[in-house]
């Protein structure tokens, strides 16, 4: 996989800088993005981050919506209007703004979590709780998939909290 994989926890230094994990920096470099694109996650109290691949995904989503539609305006506001482009120094560090830290509840440490085309930045305790919930939900979904394979005419899967 050429994307962001695994998770890492790093501390903010006395100047508020945090080191982006080397494997994540390598993906940003391959992507050709100079800096770090960051916006508050729509679904979690975390930050969505990446480079050109993330921006292309957002552009693709927006281009599928009618210009001047309420839906497009809402997505644009949430994904572009609240975003920031952060600088990354020569040692691979960046400084999260107070707005971003406040949204994600970040104080002294952050956990970087790979999602393939993007990564997220979490407050470590919030990430542990999210990971536990995700594992529980995946176990439930796996059981549903197993049951579905046993009964191929079953209705489509619907995960807890799924949107229409």
Swiss-Prot record:
A Gene Ontology annotation in the biological process aspect, one of them, is: negative regulation of DNA-templated transcription initiation
Q: What keywords sit in the KW lines?
A: Cytoplasm, DNA-binding, Repeat, Transcription, Transcription regulation
Q: Where is this region: Disordered?
A: 144-164
Q: Any idea where this protein resides?
A: Cytoplasm, Nucleoid
List cystine links: none
**Domain named SpoVT-AbrB: residues:** 7-60, 83-126
Coarsely, its chief localization is cytoplasm
InterPro entries tied to this protein? MraZ, MraZ_C, MraZ_dom, MraZ_N, MraZ_sf, SpoVT-AbrB_dom, SpoVT-AbrB_sf
Task: Quote a single Gene Ontology cellular component term.
Answer: nucleoid
Q: Which Pfam families match?
A: MraZ
Does the record bear Cytoplasm in its keywords?
A: yes
Q: Which GO terms describe its molecular function?
A: DNA-binding transcription factor activity; transcription cis-regulatory region binding
Please indicate if the UniProt record lists Nucleotide-binding as a keyword.
no
User: Whom does it interact with, and what assembly results?
Assistant: Forms oligomers.
Family membership noted in the UniProt record = Belongs to the MraZ family.
Question: What protein name applies here?
Answer: Transcriptional regulator MraZ
Query: What phylogenetic lineage does the species belong to?
Result: Bacteria, Pseudomonadati, Pseudomonadota, Alphaproteobacteria, Hyphomicrobiales
Q: Which gene specifies this protein's sequence?
A: mraZ
């Amino acid at each position: 996989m050429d994307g962001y994989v695994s998770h890492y926890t790093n501390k903010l230094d006395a100047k508020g800088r945090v080191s982006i994990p080397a494997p994540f920096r390598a993906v940003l470099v391959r992507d050709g993005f100079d800096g770090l694109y960051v916006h508050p996650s729509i679904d979690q109290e975390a930050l969505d981050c990446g480079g050109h691949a993330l921006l292309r995904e957002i552009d693709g989503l927006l281009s599928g919506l009618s210009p001047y539609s309420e839906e497009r305006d809402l997505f644009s506001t949430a994904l572009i209007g609240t975003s920031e482009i952060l600088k990354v120094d020569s040692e691979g560090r960046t400084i999260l703004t107070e707005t971003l830290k406040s949204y994600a509840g970040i104080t002294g440490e952050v956990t970087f979590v790979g999602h393939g085309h993007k990564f997220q930045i979490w407050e470590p305790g919030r990430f542990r709780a999210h990971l536990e919930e995700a594992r529980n939900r995946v176990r439930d979904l796996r059981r549903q998939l197993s049951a579905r394979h046993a009964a191929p005419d079953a209705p489509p899967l619907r995960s807890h909290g799924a949107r229409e």
